[in-house]
Amino acid sequence: LVGSEMCIRDSENFIGCDSSYRAASIVLYGAPYDSTTSYRPGARFGPAAIRHESYGLETYSPYQNADLTDFDIFDSGDLELCFGSSESALADIEARAEEILQDGKFPLLLGGEHLVTLGAVRAAVKKYPDLHIVHFDAHADLRDDYLGAKLSHACVLRRCHELVGDGRIHQFCIRSGDRAEFEFAAQHTEMHKFD
């Protein structure tokens, strides 16, 4: 067995992800984490729920004339993340993305709260220093800190900006945030507000 095929799958696979790790060009993995959620916890159940609900979809898109089964995708299951430490969870997410990238494959992450993005971006920017981020959300997530924490779902794009720099975060459908977030976005990101 290839090392990554030894992952224990504690949930069903996403529909159409039938490839082996060795043959895959895309590796899907889950980051069930929601320790900094401030409104309603439960995002940690997201990866399993997304996989479960994927079986209500079809693999073929007539709009794209493409089928998920046209791609070699391996679902490696969910990471076991430490809920007591955001930095530890981010390090695990980053390490998994780094392993996938080093194997010449594309990592595809299912979250979890928004903070999980930072771990994957940390890995991706090492391989792709000119990385751009496309962010669809109702909230800007550009606070410098939230409730005294710099590692929070409300700060994740601010931390990503520290890695990728100005003009490389493209935000769409943003409808709320505090004044400082919108002022920061005007200077540092490409924000397209919700209309």
Predicted stretch roles:
Residues 1-7:
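Short, small-residue-biased leader/transition segments that mark boundaries at the very start
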Residues 9-195:
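Conserved alpha-helical scaffold segments that buttress catalytic/binding sites
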